[in-house]
C-alpha cells in the first residue's frame, strides 16, 4: 500500500472531513512514522527555488565549501559537511545498543542552518552566493509556520490541550535546523559493497521532520506491519513539492512511544534495481533533498509528557533537549 498521501485542505472541508484527516494522520504515523501531504502552504515555485540554490551551493569547489564548514564538536550543526563526515549508521547503532563498524559511511554531503534569531550558535554562510542567506532564512520561517500547523493537528488528533507540543518550540528559542542534502552520483557497486550507503537506517533526532525530495528516488521507510524480518518500502512522491513528514525521536519520547519515530534510509532507487543487477558500474544519478528538522527548545524537557503518562512508570526520564541532542550528535561524527 505504501505511505498514505493526505490532502491538508480537508482540515477546512467541514467537521467530518477534518475528523477523517486527523484520524488518517495519526494512523499513518503509527503505521510508518511517516505521512505524505499535498495542498500544504508551501508553493511549488518556492520549493524549486530552494532546490536551485542548493544545487548552486553544492556545485562550489571543495575549497570554497570548506570556508563555511561545520565544526563537529557536538554543538548544533552549522554550515557545510563533506561527503562521509556524518555517519548515520553510528547514530542509530548507538541508540539501539549495537556496535557499528566505523567503516560504514554515508555517500552524502549536506548544509545546515539554524534560526536567524539564534544568538547562541551562529550560522555559517557561503559568502560567494548572493541571496543564498536571505532566501534560506525566509524559507526557514515559512517551514516553521507549516510545522506549527502540523503539530497543532497532532494536538487535536491526540486530544491534547492546545499548545502541548507547540509550546515546547518557541520562535525566540527555536533550535530547529534547515538542511540541504546532496547525494553525488555514485556507481551502484559502491552502494552494494556493504560499507557505503546514501544514508544508513536511522531516526531523526528532533520532533518532526519536513522533507522535500528531488525526482531521483531512494528514500525508504520501515514497514512496521510487514511480517518476518525488517522490511523497507519506497516513498515515492508524485511531485517535488509534495511534503513528506516523519516522526522523530523527541516526539516518540514525549508521547511515551505512542508515536514511534520513523526509521528510514536512502538507497538505490527501486526503478534502477533491474538495470544494476547486471552491471555494478551503472551510475546512480545525483539526488537532492530539503529537510526542516523541527527540534524542541534547548532547555525543554524531552522526557515523557504528563498527558501521555498512563499510571505506569514513564519510559523516558526528564532531560533537556540540549543534553539529549548533544549526546546523540557526538555518536554521528
From Swiss-Prot:
The keyword Oxidoreductase applies. 2-oxoglutarate-dependent dioxygenase; part of the gene cluster that mediates the biosynthesis of UCS1025A, a member of the pyrrolizidinone family that acts as a strong telomerase inhibitor and displays potent antibacterial and antitumor properties. These compounds share a hemiaminal-containing pyrrolizidinone core fused with a gamma-lactone, giving a furopyrrolizidine that is connected to a decalin fragment. Pfam families: 2OG-FeII_Oxy, DIOX_N. Residues 174-296 form the Fe2OG dioxygenase domain. Binds 1 Fe(2+) ion per subunit. The lineage of its organism: Eukaryota, Fungi, Dikarya, Ascomycota, Pezizomycotina. Its EC number is 1.14.11.-. Fe cation binds at residues 202, 204, 264. It comes from the Eukaryota. GO terms for biological process: small molecule biosynthetic process. This is 2-oxoglutarate-dependent dioxygenase ucsF. It comes from Acremonium sp. Disruption phenotype: Leads to the complete abolishment of all products. 2-oxoglutarate binds at residue 287. Coiled coil: none annotated. Its cofactor is Fe(2+). GO terms for molecular function: dioxygenase activity; metal ion binding. SUPFAM superfamilies: Clavaminate synthase-like (SSF51197). The keyword Oxidoreductase applies. Signal peptide: none annotated. Belongs to the iron/ascorbate-dependent oxidoreductase family. Pathway: Mycotoxin biosynthesis. Keywords: Dioxygenase, Iron, Metal-binding, Oxidoreductase. InterPro entries: DIOX_N, IPNS-like_FE2OG_OXY, IPNS-like_sf, Iron_ascorbate_oxido_reductase, Oxoglu/Fe-dep_dioxygenase_dom.
Amino acid at each position: 500500500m505504501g505511505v498514505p498521501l493526505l490532502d491538508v485542505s480537508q482540515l477546512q472541508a467541514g467537521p467530518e472531513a477534518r475528523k477523517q484527516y486527523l484520524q488518517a494522520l495519526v494512523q499513518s504515523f503509527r503505521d510508518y512514522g511517516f505521512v505524505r501531504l499535498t495542498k500544504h502552504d508551501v508553493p511549488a515555485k518556492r520549493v524549486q527555488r530552494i532546490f536551485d540554490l542548493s544545487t548552486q551551493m553544492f556545485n562550489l569547489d571543495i575549497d570554497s565549501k570548506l570556508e563555511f564548514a561545520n565544526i563537529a564538536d557536538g554543538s548544533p550543526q552549522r554550515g557545510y559537511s563533506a561527503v562521509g563526515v556524518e555517519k548515520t549508521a553510528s547514530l542509530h547503532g548507538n541508540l539501539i545498543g549495537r556496535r557499528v563498524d566505523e567503516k560504514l559511511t554515508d555517500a552524502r554531503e549536506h548544509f545546515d542552518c539554524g534560526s536567524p534569531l539564534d544568538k547562541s550558535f551562529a550560522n555559517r554562510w557561503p559568502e560567494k552566493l548572493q541571496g543564498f542567506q536571505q532566501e534560506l532564512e525566509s524559507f526557514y520561517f515559512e517551514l516553521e509556520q507549516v510545522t506549527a500547523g502540523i503539530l497543532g493537528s497532532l494536538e487535536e488528533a491526540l486530544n491534547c490541550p492546545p499548545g502541548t507540543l507547540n509550546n515546547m518550540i518557541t520562535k525566540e528559542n527555536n533550535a530547529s535546523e534547515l538542511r540541504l542534502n546532496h547525494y553525488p552520483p555514485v556507481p551502484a557497486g559502491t552502494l552494494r559493497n556493504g560499507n557505503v550507503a546514501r544514508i544508513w537506517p536511522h531516526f531523526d533526532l528532533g520532533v518532526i521532520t519536513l522533507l522535500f525530495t528531488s525526482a531521483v528516488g531512494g528514500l525508504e521507510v520501515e514497514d512496521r506491519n510487514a511480517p518476518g524480518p525488517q522490511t523497507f518500502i519506497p516513498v515515492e512522491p508524485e511531485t517535488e513539492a509534495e511534503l513528506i513528514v516523519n516522526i522523530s525521536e523527541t516526539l516518540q519520547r514525549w508521547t511515551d512511544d505512542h508515536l514511534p519515530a520513523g526509521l528510514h534510509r536512502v538507497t538505490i532507487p527501486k526503478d534502477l534495481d533491474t538495470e544494476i543487477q547486471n552491471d555494478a558500474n551503472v551510475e546512480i544519478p545525483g539526488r537532492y533533498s530539503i529537510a526542516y528538522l523541527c527540534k524542541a527548545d534547548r532547555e525543554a524537557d524531552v522526557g515523557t509528557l504528563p498527558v501521555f503518562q498512563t499510571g505506569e512508570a514513564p519510559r523516558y526520564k526528564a532531560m533537556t533537549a540540549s543534553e539529549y541532542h548533544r549526546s546523540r550528535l557526538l555518536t554521528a561524527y
